Swiss-Prot record:
Record localization: Cytoplasm
Function of the molecule: Together with its co-chaperonin GroES, plays an essential role in assisting protein folding. The GroEL-GroES system forms a nano-cage that allows encapsulation of the non-native substrate proteins and provides a physical environment optimized to promote and accelerate protein folding.
Subunit structure: Forms a cylinder of 14 subunits composed of two heptameric rings stacked back-to-back. Interacts with the co-chaperonin GroES.
Top-level division of the source organism's lineage: Bacteria
Primary location recorded for the protein, binned into one broad class: cytoplasm
GO cellular component, one term: cytoplasm
Stored Gene3D superfamilies: GroEL, GroEL-like equatorial domain, TCP-1-like chaperonin intermediate domain
Protein name, entry field: Chaperonin GroEL 2
Name of the coding gene: groEL2
MF (Gene Ontology): ATP binding; ATP-dependent protein folding chaperone; isomerase activity; unfolded protein binding
Length: 542
């Protein structure tokens, strides 16, 4: 085992502080509407230009291993905040730096770090309570657009696009961000349920120009098994041919004789039909087929339910107003499912989202929920160069998370003002003298985001903080325009979830670092010179 190096007490804390400052000073220049960019070198390709705090934080590795520990702890603050709220990473970093900087002075002066930590925890609890109490629920698309604009660093087009997307697919709908092929940023909305399986044969196409198969007012047969034998399908095909309706078959696969018969009937015009493979794999496929069945008021034909293909009647089939199939996707619009059953299915999926621990499963469940609730919106981000595209895409993703957070827990005045207003909640706290120091650390630290926003805008932080503190409610400083006024009316707003998560994560990690007394790291290995180098080339005979 390699030898370890250990440092204690004051030297440990000063090393942590040096690491915290190195990372936070690089991140905090990006805060606010007048924040600056950071350029990051890449081992290949062009450098990345970013104004996103967590992207900067993730790139920082310090040479000194003890300082690096401090930097990595603060990096954890930024990435945790990004995971929970999707935004507020720079605010969280600024708060963590302020809490640790103030706290380490007190610990050095001989105060009890455990009591300080308790004071910090109580203060954070009081502020979170105050933030939740003063939250205003987002009602209209305009407010959602304002949240998106601020999170996208003042880009109004992004804010408006996201507000449109939310209006079209609902608050639970899935909004995805993709790179566009052109320089324009656009919004595509897919209504109804779409899954990534196309037609099994191009002979099903009804619109040769667009290469799409369109079915109107059709029946939908949903089977879990592979269909290859024509005999099994005959009874249901005859019934549908009599009813003069159209048919979509969704099955594990349709092949051989069964597929050939469907194609021949389609070409002869005796039966207007199409077949696609079922989406997903394994258990997820079963669940997705149940979703389609619920949406269209059909029945999944599965042997475990005692249903066989040859016994299927028209009443077991789903119904939909329109089905559009291209070579890659199938979209079902206007499913005839019963509202109460669809609601029950949505609740079931929501419960699974609450209980799952896997991020991948959660993402897939949210996609399924969105398809049942209303649809999917795709924001296609366009830019003139790839460097700009990457930077813009990161901003759109941030803005998307922020708008979701705003819808979830409501909004408060932005620009660091909500935290200043929450200072009043610290007056009534019952704490002992040592804990009071912890409370005072938080009182001072929560001014830091506003100070930094002002400094980045070229103003003197202390003067701005004093002016804002003298005001009431939503009165604050709009760094984008340089004016003071009602921030809610000006559209300078932050989601409660973002502000809350930033403070909670910053306080959690900073107070842990305050109670640290020793750091242990591996001693660097000394490089030995290569053996035999001195005698090489002297013509020895062996």
């Amino acid at each position: 085992m390699a030898a370890k190096e250990i440092i204690y007490n004051e030297s440990a804390r000063s090393m942590i502080l040096a690491g915290v400052n190195a990372l936070a000073d690089a991140v905090k220049v990006t805060l606010g509407p007048k924040g600056r960019n950071v350029v990051i070198e890449k081992s290949f390709g062009s450098p990345t230009v970013t104004k996103d705090g967590v992207t900067v934080a993730k790139e920082i590795e310090l040479e000194n291993r003890f300082e690096n520990m401090g930097a990595q702890m603060v990096r954890e603050v930024a990435s945790k905040t990004s995971d929970i709220a999707g935004d507020g990473t720079t605010t969280a970093t600024v708060l963590a730096q302020a809490i640790y900087r103030e706290g380490s002075k007190l610990v050095a002066a001989g105060h009890n770090p455990m009591e300080i930590k308790r004071g910090i925890d109580k203060a954070v609890e009081a502020i979170v309570e105050h933030l939740r109490g003063s939250a205003k629920q987002t009602k209209d698309a305009k407010e959602i657009a304002q949240v998106g604009t601020i999170s996208a660093n003042g880009d109004e087009t992004i804010g408006k696009l996201l507000a449109d997307a939310m209006e079209k697919v609902g608050k639970e709908g899935v909004i995805t961000v993709e790179e566009a092929k052109s320089a324009d940023t656009t919004l595509d909305v897919v209504e109804g349920m779409q899954f990534d399986r196309g037609y099994l044969s191009p002979y099903f196409v009804t619109d040769p120009e667009a290469m799409k198969a369109n079915l109107e007012d059709c029946y939908i047969l949903i089977s879990e098994k592979k269909i290859s034998n024509m005999k099994d399908l005959l009874p249901v095909l005859e019934a549908i041919a009599k009813s003069q309706k159209q048919l979509l078959i969704i099955a594990e696969d349709v092949e051989g004789e069964a597929l050939a018969t469907l194609v021949v009937n389609k070409l002869r015009g005796t039966l207007h039909c199409a077949a696609v493979k079922a989406p997903g794999f394994g258990d997820r496929r079963k669940e997705m087929l149940k979703d389609i069945a619920t949406l269209t008021d059909g029945q999944v034909i599965a042997e475990e339910l005692g249903l066989k293909l040859e016994n299927v009647t028209i009443s077991d089939l789903g119904r939909a107003k329109t089905v559009i199939i291209d070579k890659d996707n199938t979209t079902i619009v206007g499913g005839q499912g019963k509202k109460d059953k669809i609601k029950a299915r949505q609740q079931e999926i929501r419960a699974q989202i609450e209980n799952t621990t896997s991020d991948y499963d959660r993402e897939k469940l949210q996609e399924r929920l969105a398809k049942l609730v209303g649809g999917v919106a795709v924001v296609k981000v366009g830019a003139a160069t790839e460097t700009e595209m990457k930077e813009k895409k990161a901003r759109v993703e941030d803005a998307l998370h922020a708008t979701r957070a705003a819808v979830e827990e409501g909004i408060v005045p932005g620009g660091g003002v909500a935290l200043i207003r929450a200072q009043s909640s610290l007056e009534k706290l019952k704490v002992n003298d040592e804990q009071r120091f912890g409370v005072n650390i938080i009182r001072r630290a929560i001014e830091e985001p506003l100070r930094q926003i002002s400094a980045n805008a070229g103003e003197e932080g202390s003067i701005v903080v004093q002016k804002v503190r003298d005001g009431k409610d939503s009165y604050g400083y709009n760094a984008a325009s340089g004016d003071y006024g009602n921030l809610l009316e000006m559209g300078v707003i932050d989601p409660v979830k973002v502000v809350r998560s930033a403070l909670q994560n910053a306080a959690s990690v900073a107070s842990l670092m305050l109670t640290t007394e020793a750091l242990i790291a591996e001693r660097p290995k000394e490089e030995k010179p290569a053996a035999g180098g001195a005698h090489a080339g002297h013509g020895h005979d062996f």
